[in-house]
Every structure is written in structure tokens, then in C-alpha cells.
Amino acid sequence: ALDTIAEPMWLYAQADLLATQHRYPAARGKLDSLITTWPGHPLEDEVLMQLAQMALAENDVDTAMVMLQEIVSLHFDDILADDALFQLADLHQNWLNDADAALPLYEQLLFEFPGSLHAIEARRRFRALRGDDTEL
């Protein structure tokens, strides 16, 4: 019998290689299969992040935002949650030019993930969007 723990890892590794090769449809198929076959698997946030990155590479901002929001909503305690939140805020700010939507996302990152690698940049952007005098 196959080791059911190793199989999702193998499938994810194959999808990651395909994504690195810019073979997005094939990678997406493997990732979708992983989510369908093993719902709730610990790799699910990595799968969603990979799907978001591929969507961004194809300029599909709407799909990327859905994937990132799903990570923030369902995997808020996982290692990629702060990355997803920062990317989501960045998309609102820089792709959609929607500072009003980006501001609370940066604030959420600062309060929920104060130790994040993104905290310094999120604080800088939050203050700039809020209109604070940053020349002090």
C-alpha cells in the first residue's frame, strides 16, 4: 500500500516543479487534485499560495485575491497567513489603487502578526496611507 502521507507531498512537489517551469495548467491540475483528494491537508495553505502566485503570473488578480483571502480566512494560524495578508493588502494598494481596502489589511497584519517579517513595511505603508507625517 502507498504511504498516504507521502503522496500529497509528492503531488505538491510535482506541481511546484511544473509551476517553476511556467507550466501553469498542468501545475494547477495537480494542485486542484491535491485539494480535492485530501481536503484539509496541512499543505492546503501552500497549495492556495501556489495557486495565487500562478494567478498573479498570469495577471489574474481576482483569482489571486480569492486564494489569498482563503488563506487569511481559513489558515489564519498557519505560517503563510501573514504573507497572504501582506500580498492581499499590496494588491489592493498597488494593483487596484484601493487604499481604503488596503489600510485595514495592513492594520490587521500589524495587530495579528506583530513579529512578521512584513511588519516594518506594513507599518510604513499603513502610516503613509493614513497620512501620518513620516518626516519626523
Where are these regions (language model features)?
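Acidic, polar-rich low-complexity tracts and alpha-helical solenoid repeat scaffolds
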Residues: 1-136
